[in-house]
Amino acid sequence: MWYDGIDRNTFIKQIYTKVPELLNVRIDAISLKRDGTEVSVVFDMPVYPDNPPEKWNGNNTVSIEISFFVISEFKLEMKDRYMYGNIDIFSHESKIKIVVDGSILCSFVAEAAVIQRMSAYIYIT
């Protein structure tokens, strides 16, 4: 699964009976640190969890931030004003390859990744 090579993935496995693939997700931010060694991706999970913590009651959307470290081969192309697309995260030559394909095209390779935060909120369409 996409989260297997990411540190601090225990919580996501606890709140989902089956963690969904990252298909057609709303992407809030893709940020590259000034020195180019870290990329953070913030996006909404495509499905609300079936076992959310009690403090999330009343919410309908989960936001997740993943930070990737020691970045190479970074590419980014905007096709639309709003960012959404499929996010594919997989093992690649003992590193982590990230590919975003949708209204934004982004790809890069990282040596490590960690889930920095997960939070819930009410998304209004």
Where would I find each of the regions flagged by the language model?
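Surface-exposed, interaction-prone regions used to assemble/regulate multi-protein complexes
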Residues: 1-125
